[in-house]
Amino acid sequence: MTSTSAGGEQQDYIGKNSMDSYEVKKVTAPVNWETDVPGSKSITNRALLLAALCREQVRLQGVLFSDDSRHFLSSLQSLGYEVQIDEAACAVEVHGHGGSLPVTSGEIHVGSAGTAARFLTAMLGVAEGTFVIQASEQMKKRPMKPLFEALLSLGASVEWLGAAWHLPVRITGAGAHIRNLSGQAVLNLDISESTQFLSAFLLIAPLFPHGIRIHITSAKTDGSYIRITRRMMEEFGVEAVFDGCDYMVQAAGGYQRSGYQIEPDVSGACYFYAAAAMTGGSAKVHHVHWSSMQGDMKFLKLLEQMGCTLTEEDDGIRLNGPSDGLKGLKVDMNDFSDQALTLAAIAPYASSDVTITHIGHIRGQECDRLYAIVMNLKNAGITCEEGDDWVCIHPGKPQPCRIETFDDHRVAMAFTVMGLGCDGIEILNPGCCKKTFENYFVVLDSLLKH
């Protein structure tokens, strides 16, 4: 059995690999792995905002340190928050400032972090003061319009510093107007492009003195990441109620918490589980349990439908892949779409077609992920068809090719798994994984060496 940790310093990749490309090493036998993964990005960035809105000092443990979370941390520091960082201990202490910001002007850079972009824009849009929000070229292309429309309806003003309805912007918050409201704030919100828009307003709800009601105008009204947001809000002392159409947060005393433990990243764990499923091997990721709040736990159940067996042990869930190969299936992945790439990457090894539906929104993420799936599979000689929100992948043997990652961490990590089962797969720009899992390839190489 091979075991490794996600911690430690960044290292060079072994073999003929560099930061420009990574040549995946085909495994010659079913994998038998145990490993750790870093903390959850989604939980880390929600916890950072919740801690900043507390009225006390909050110690966060199990923090993910990656490109996304570092941009979130540096943005909080740019806004005047006192933050102590201990990367070796995966810990951060945030001195909360309650219902107000430490400063009334400033500039932040959110990089490519969608959570930082949506959450912090919402917070600044209901604060008092004027702020500039900068972003990476990738983030400048991602959807923001429903968030800006909601902020404008609340009384914020926005100056576009680039394309309209996109970052970068100069925003003057609606704090004075919101403070003078005589009753509950009400807004309409379309979350069809991203549930982060709703999570953003739920997280900042305690900044509204008489509470807030959010009416969802899109067909999609809920999702796994919204449920993470609501659960974490409750753990920090504030309840968000959903009646099927509207989300309501009553006026409350604000968030309260002195410490918080962040779960391991299930999204990152899924790549190791997928490798075991594909090769008919075994994988256990430490501290991943069925009690996790993360929606990507559904991917493990999906692998079970494809023929894998799952066992919860004291220190994590173990997956054993089928000795006779994976079964094909048709699955709606709308609620755990980050793993659509992972399923697509192992789909050629299934015994029958794999069809993934209701994932049209992934076209507007770090890249057009549906396009990335189809283009890379076809480059590998795999037959597939796509529609606006679905893809069907036929069984086949992947041929040597270079995987275009489009600077998208999930494209890189998912198609690396495909390369474990065949020769000649080269991942371009593997450094894009720094967004959420800095040493993914270091961990993988350590597992492959044994």
What feature does the model see in each segment?
Residues 12-450:
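Structural preference for solvent-exposed beta-strand-turn elements
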Residues 1-9:
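Ser/Thr/Pro/Gly-rich low-complexity, intrinsically disordered segments
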